[in-house]
Amino acid sequence: MDIGDFVKLELENTTYSGTVMPSLNEDTVVIKMKSGYNVGLDKKKIKNIEILESGDKPKYGLPPLNLEKNPKLKNISILSTGGTVASRVDYKTGAVHPAFTADDLIRAVPELMDIANIKGKVILNILSENMLPAYWKMTADAIKEEIENGAEGIVIAHGTDTMHYTASALSFMVTSEVPIILVGAQRSSDRPSSDAALNIIAAVKAATEPIKGVYVLMHGETGDTVCHLHEGTKVRKLHSSRRDAFKSVNETPIAEINPFIKKVTYLRDVKSQDKSKIKEVVLNTDLEEKVALIKVYPGIDSEILKFYVDNGYKGIILEGTGLGHTPETFFEGIDYANENNVLVAMTTQTINGRVNMNVYSNGRELQAKGVIPCEDMLPEVAFVKLMHLLGNYGFEESKELMSKNIVGEINESINLEC
């Protein structure tokens, strides 16, 4: 039984048929079924193997493309951190492989040749749930290198689970005149419903626009009509599987992009770039990693806060209830944090809306204990911002800056139509 063979595998009480795929575990057989889904089976539990059709061993070597630069098009660098958005499929085995040479990208999405001169580079190849602050720094360094080498726009292919964390981190870390677009895919490129190709087409188009800042680009609705460009500090993944999982929160998207006709329609004001400074990049990648994000719930114990304080944490972001509250039984832990110079700040777990700790006595008492209200900041954004502040400023200055807008993370007022 070799990769590419179509087989029938009999277990104790069921039978599976499909194409044998590469497996990372020698004790597991992975097959792709006709439904398009993969299944991994323990070799020890397989009672009988029947090869229904022999397949050719997959060959991944491809002749090079003649990719001449078009002087009329902008130079866009696509950086990969992992994820499925820019992978390619071996159609003999059904296996999905990273596609991050420029040749691979053009083969996977040939429409890119009409939009920009493409350069592909792998930074990381990880599942996004394994993202670390150290990897944010690596990504920022790679962005700086590409811009200094002539990139006029950056696209970052990223797994969707933590993409909004990375977008927030890069917003605080990177100051540049070029657009930095994070893009992902909710459906793998081996599925008919994949959103990968349209998302990357729209992302590259966005990267050619005369704008600056960090953005997230994903499907704007469940069909294949438009993609939305979201501000990097005002976006969140709000559905586990829908293709339009990413939404702007407390704000409208920056733009709507039609990937078929390559049309960008701006929905609100955007930061325009200064072309005279296009190669200038300033990085600030200093982070205090001893910051925690805690969700408040009925019965939450002060011992949780004490644990973080006793283990050297410098900052705590609370996802409070409603307008920014905790149970009174949690006040003891907040006092303990304050006594030990651990900065505590408050967001709301409602996601939409803003913290207002002046309405009820609970909120006012929390403020008296030193808790900083985070206005309409998303919890994940506040988490990253506090890491950034404590990595660069002292305790008192960090407290002062926490509730002030730095890179678009706070709105003075909320659009009620959002």
Curated annotation (Swiss-Prot):
PROSITE patterns xrefs: ASN_GLN_ASE_1, ASN_GLN_ASE_2, ASN_GLN_ASE_3
InterPro entries given in the database record: AsnA_fam, Asp/glu_Ase-like_sf, Asparaginase/glutaminase-like, Asparaginase/glutaminase_AS1, Asparaginase/glutaminase_AS2, Asparaginase_C, GatD, GatD_N
Active site annotation, chain numbering: 84, 160, 161, 237
SUPFAM superfamilies the record matches: GatD N-terminal domain-like, Glutaminase/Asparaginase
Stretch forming the signal peptide: none
Residue pairs linked by disulfide bridges in the UniProt entry: none
Catalysed reaction equations from the record: L-glutamyl-tRNA(Gln) + L-glutamine + ATP + H2O = L-glutaminyl-tRNA(Gln) + L-glutamate + ADP + phosphate + H(+)
GO MF annotation, one: asparaginase activity
Keywords linked to the UniProt accession: ATP-binding, Ligase, Nucleotide-binding, Protein biosynthesis
Stated role: Allows the formation of correctly charged Gln-tRNA(Gln) through the transamidation of misacylated Glu-tRNA(Gln) in organisms which lack glutaminyl-tRNA synthetase. The reaction takes place in the presence of glutamine and ATP through an activated gamma-phospho-Glu-tRNA(Gln). The GatDE system is specific for glutamate and does not act on aspartate.
Oligomeric form and interacting partners: Heterodimer of GatD and GatE.
Protein name as catalogued: Glutamyl-tRNA(Gln) amidotransferase subunit D
Organism: Methanococcus maripaludis (strain C5 / ATCC BAA-1333)
Organism lineage: Archaea, Methanobacteriati, Methanobacteriota, Methanomada group, Methanococci
